[in-house]
Each structure stands twice: as C-alpha cells, then as structure tokens.
Design a protein with these regions (language model features):
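Short coil/turn segments at secondary-structure boundaries
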Residues: 41-44, 178-182, 203-206, 216-218, ...
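Acidic/histidine-rich catalytic cores and adjacent linkers
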Residues: 238-239, 300-441
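RNase H-like nuclease fold core
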Residues: 108-233, 240
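Short, conserved DNA-binding cores of transcription-related domains
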Residues: 1-46
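Intrinsically disordered, low-complexity acidic and serine/threonine/proline-rich regulatory regions
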Residues: 33-147, 151-157
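Long, contiguous regulatory modules within eukaryotic nuclear regulatory proteins
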Residues: 1-19, 164, 168, 394-409
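Conserved beta-strand -> loop -> alpha-helix junction used to position metal-binding or nucleic-acid-contacting
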Residues: 234-331
Length: 441
C-alpha cells in the first residue's frame, strides 16, 4: 500500500461542545478496484492497542461521536440516559454556537467601523444557523458500537468469574422487564451466581427447569478448563434432596461433589401455603419468629457489637452506663446483619422450635376473627417440609461470611460482613456490575 494523498471522504465528528472533521490518508492497494477506507475496522484492528486507542471517535453510518462524549454514556448512575446526555450536549453545543456567533458579529462590526473610508461597502454573510444534535436513539447506537468493539474483552471478564459458593435460582421477575419484539419470547430466567452477587451464567427459557443441564454443565466446563477447584456449596430454591440419595441438582453439576443446600428464604416461603393470607397483621411477626427458629446469632459477634454500642452510648450520655434493655433498643436489625454472623441450628432443635411456634400461633386471630393459620394446610406443609431440615444445615468447614471492610463505632473496630448463604438475591435485577450472557432456548 502506498500513500496517494488525502482520502476523498471526510467524517464529521460530534464533540462535547462542537464539531470537527476526521480526515484520513488515501492508501490504495495494488489492486486498483479495491478501495481501502482509512478508518475501517479491518484497518484499525491491525493496530496494536496503544495506537488503536488514539483513534478519537466511535463511528456510525453517517456521523461519529468523540470518545469524550461516549464516556458520558457509560456511568450507570440514577437518571443517566441517552436522552439526558443528548440534551446536555445539545445545550453545550448551543452555548458554544452562541459564543462563536457573538464573536463573529463583533468582528463584523469592528471591521465595518474600520472600513468607513473604503468606497465599496463590505458585505457580511449571516452567521451559520444552529445545527441540532441527532436524536437520543443515535447516542444509543454509538454506545452499542462502543460496547461491541470491546466484546472479546467483556466475554473474557464474564467467563473468568468464579466462586466458592454458587447459587442457582429461577424467576419470572426479570423476564417481565423484557420489552419490544422479545417481550413474550421467554417466561423464566435461570441464573447461577457466586457469593459476591456476580452472575456466572444465565439462560432464558419458556418454562421453569428447561435448559438447566446446559447451563450447569457450561459452568462445570468453565471451572475445569480454568483449573479452578469445584465450589464448596451450592444453594438452590428446589430439588435440594431426593429419596434415591442423589438430588437432581447434584446430577446437573456432575461430577462435582459439592454440598447442595436449600435456601432458607424459599423454605420459609413454603409455610405461606399454610396461612390464611400473607396480608394478615401477624404475618410479619410469624416470619420473624420462623427465621429465629432456623438461625442463631454468633454470641461473640453480638458481644463485640454490644460493647461498641455501649461505648457509643456512654460518649453521648455523659458517661452513663445503659441498662441491657436500653442497649438492645439501640441495636438495629441492619447493624446485626452487617456486623454479626448467624449459624443454622441443629435439625432437632429446629424441629422442636418450629413445632412450638406453630402451637403458639395455632389459634391466633386478628381483630376481625380471621385466623393466621389454616390448620389442615399447615399440618400438610409441616409434614412435608420436615424432611428438608437437613438441607438447611450450614455445610461443615465452609466459611459462609466474607469480611468486606471495617467500621469504627464507639471507638471499637467492627468487621463488615457479607453472607454467602442463600439464592434469593438472584431473583432481582442486580444494580451494580451485573454482567451475564443470555442464551435463548
């Protein structure tokens, strides 16, 4: 290829507050019928990363957007959208156009005063009119083109995500957010995530349970190819055990020998079938009591939190020591969850406590006389769910809590903990760093 001047076409680029033109060199090939565009993807892909990063814009069919403008499309903050970026940049363009117009008219006026003694009158052209920016949809196209240019890197990041504790869950909540032509193409989404809330793999299907074998074996293959150790535990919302001894989930993740456990949230939700209504005034109290029947707080963590809160109380109450009741009243449920670990009680302890709870609420009613518990339904629910008490137990030797930071409270340093137990977090749309590959089946 030899240079023969400037390429016959130029590209208009929209900057943050102005426009400029992209000019390239003309490098004809030895074949005269073969035209080579200097900014084609085939040419740019041959450059090394350092030189490719110098290319200033993201191209579309007609126009291009400077990379400084593309940066504004990337933040996932609340309220940021292509419409917001389009309106903000158009405002910046209009202000710059107004400044340039005022400068041009001022120069014309000054030139007119200086040309008073020239016989022929000077002719001044009107300033150029303001050119609106493209619609917000064009900015979305630019953002899509920018993402596609990093597709290989994004795939590499997504498929390099692993975890010690995996969670598998199927839900309809996310598929209800699908719009457009694919709005009714899927009814369920099944996700596999790790203890950090990252999604390893997803599949969109027309029914619950479909495509799970390919989903799970894909994760197994990923671990095998990367030389990663198999997860220590897998939390699921169903099929945690089997009368034959090998659960369906264990078969899906064959040949892994990871412990399969039932998510406690889904276990407690099954008791709703034994209640008259979820809108009963005593429903919240019942759920809180049921949770306390399954879990017990780590007393060492609770004691450290109480010492920190006691010191905090003394500093704000002139050194007075609070009573136990006053101290416990200052500890919120959020603080317990943030700084204290929980463990599952033993099988027989859970069985006895839930049985006692059901006996205590058996005849409870609201002010209208509506019972909280439907007797026949609850008897059947409890009879069936007792076989899953073993599936609720914490896996032996598995650290379910991760320290993510520290916090100073009352002069004491407290750990901020993240729990890896449970799968219900996969039922909602993640808000930070959600990256996954969707497969339609």
């Amino acid at each position: 290829m030899n240079s023969s001047g400037i390429y016959r076409k130029v590209r208009e680029v929209i900057d943050v507050d102005s426009r400029y033109y992209l000019v390239g060199g003309d490098y004809p090939c030895s074949n005269p019928s073969l035209l080579v565009c200097p900014w084609s993807q085939d040419i740019l892909s041959q450059l090394d990363v350092a030189h490719r990063s110098l290319f200033p814009a993201v191209l579309t069919t007609q126009l291009a957007l400077d990379r400084k403008g593309v940066t504004f499309l990337k933040p996932r903050t609340s309220g940021n959208s292509s419409s917001y970026v389009q309106s903000a940049m158009e405002e910046a363009h209009s202000e710059e156009w107004a400044r340039q117009t005022i400068r041009y008219l001022s120069d014309c006026e000054r030139h007119k005063k200086m040309a008073t003694f020239i016989p022929s009158a000077a002719v001044y052209l009107p300033p150029p009119t303001f050119r609106p920016l493209p619609l917000a949809q064009w900015f979305e196209t630019v953002h899509s083109n920018d993402i596609l240019s990093h597709l290989d890197e994004m795939k590499g990041v997504i498929t390099s995500t692993y975890g010690r504790i995996l969670k598998m869950d199927s839900t309809k909540k996310i598929t209800k957010k699908l719009a457009g032509g694919i709005g009714d193409s899927a009814a369920w989404i099944s996700n596999i995530g790790n203890e950090f809330g990252q999604v390893l793999n997803s599949v969109l299907t027309s029914g619950e349970g479909a495509g799970l074998e390919e989903l799970c074996q894909g994760v197994v293959t990923r671990y095998k190819n990367a030389g990663q150790a198999e997860p220590e535990a897998i939390y699921v919302d169903r099929d945690c055990c089997s009368q034959s001894g090998v659960s369906s989930v264990a078969k899906l993740f064959h040949p892994w020998q990871s412990a399969v456990r039932l998510d406690s949230f889904h276990f407690m939700r099954r008791f709703n079938c034994g209640l008259t209504t979820e809108h009963h005034p005593l429903y919240g109290i019942f759920c809180a009591k049921l949770s306390s029947c399954i879990f017990a707080w780590d007393q060492e963590d609770v004691q450290r939190l109480k010492e920190a809160k006691r010191a905090e109380w003394k500093s704000s109450h002139s050194g007075h020591t609070p009573t136990e009741e006053q101290l416990m009243a200052t500890i919120s449920p959020g603080e317990l969850k943030r700084h204290c670990r929980r463990r599952t009680r033993g099988v027989e302890e859970i069985r006895g406590m839930i049985s006692g709870l059901l006996e205590s609420v058996w005849e409870l009613t609201d002010t209208t006389g509506l019972r909280l518990v439907s007797h026949d339904s609850m008897r059947h629910v409890w009879e069936v769910q007792q076989k899953h008490l073993e599936c609720l137990q914490d896996p032996a030797g598995v650290a379910l809590y991760t320290k993510v930071g520290t916090l100073q409270k009352g002069g004491k340093e407290l750990d901020i903990l993240r729990c890896g137990r449970g799968s219900s977090s996969l039922e909602r749309t993640p808000t930070v760093g959600y990256s996954c590959v969707f497969t339609l089946q």
